[in-house]
């Protein structure tokens, strides 16, 4: 099974490598699919945010760099899907100005059989868009959310 992780999963939940995906999704094998748009979203958070989100984005980007560029193995295979070329008509018709739509468009044009793809997100709009387009969807259990660090006052 191919699983597409939305950026909110990568930023707000424990490491994708610590989640028992086979148990969560009731499958034998999992390949993590990273799209160009998700990587851009992570890079933007790494460059523009401050504090915990920036730190988390840097860690996520670094791990994917180790795996995809450095050739290091991870717990799960990772596949990179570059942003697909879209004509002006496709950009308008599929509303590709929305990042979620671009992610789904990229997967559809990657050559993967969408019957083998599950979109994992905590974003209701993303899950609805994916479901409407025929993808399997999965909302990750909150037990995998990163623990909030106590504030200085606590």
Label each residue range with its predicted role.
Residues 1-118, 124-154:
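Active-site-proximal, substrate-binding regions of enzyme catalytic domains
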